[in-house]
Amino acid sequence: MAHAVKIYDTCIGCTQCVRACPTDVLEMIPWDGCKANQIASAPRTEDCVGCKRCESRCPTDFLSVRVYLGNETTRSMGLSY
């Protein structure tokens, strides 16, 4: 089962989500659009286990996790979009 990680533009570059992820799905990349000049990115979504630790640590609710089976969304993980 794959999980998709959606990054929103409210990231403040605090790195809380990156440090919370047990499977290193997230990383910080340079970004001119936020105060910290970096934003979370999810280059390894195939490693996401859907634990949502990143979501719970985020102070701005900037990301969400959805569960996918194949190419089709089968259920959301109780998040508002």
UniProtKB/Swiss-Prot annotation:
Report the cofactors: [4Fe-4S] cluster
Q: Where does [4Fe-4S] cluster 1 bind?
A: C11, C14, C17, C58
Cite the EC number: 1.97.1.12
State the name under which the record lists this protein.
Photosystem I iron-sulfur center
Location within or outside the cell: Plastid, Chloroplast thylakoid membrane
Please share the entry's free-text remark on the cofactor.
Answer: Binds 2 [4Fe-4S] clusters. Cluster 2 is most probably the spectroscopically characterized electron acceptor FA and cluster 1 is most probably FB.
One GO BP on record is: photosynthetic electron transport in photosystem I
HAMAP family per record: PSI_PsaC (MF_01303)
Reactions that this protein is recorded to catalyse: reduced [plastocyanin] + hnu + oxidized [2Fe-2S]-[ferredoxin] = oxidized [plastocyanin] + reduced [2Fe-2S]-[ferredoxin]
Kindly list the positions annotated as binding [4Fe-4S] cluster 2. Answer: C21, C48, C51, C54
Annotated membrane topology: Peripheral membrane protein
Q: How does it assemble?
A: The eukaryotic PSI reaction center is composed of at least 11 subunits.
MF GO annotations? 4 iron, 4 sulfur cluster binding; electron transfer activity; metal ion binding; oxidoreductase activity
**A Gene Ontology cellular-component term:** chloroplast thylakoid membrane
Q: Which residues form the 4Fe-4S ferredoxin-type domain?
A: 2-31, 39-68
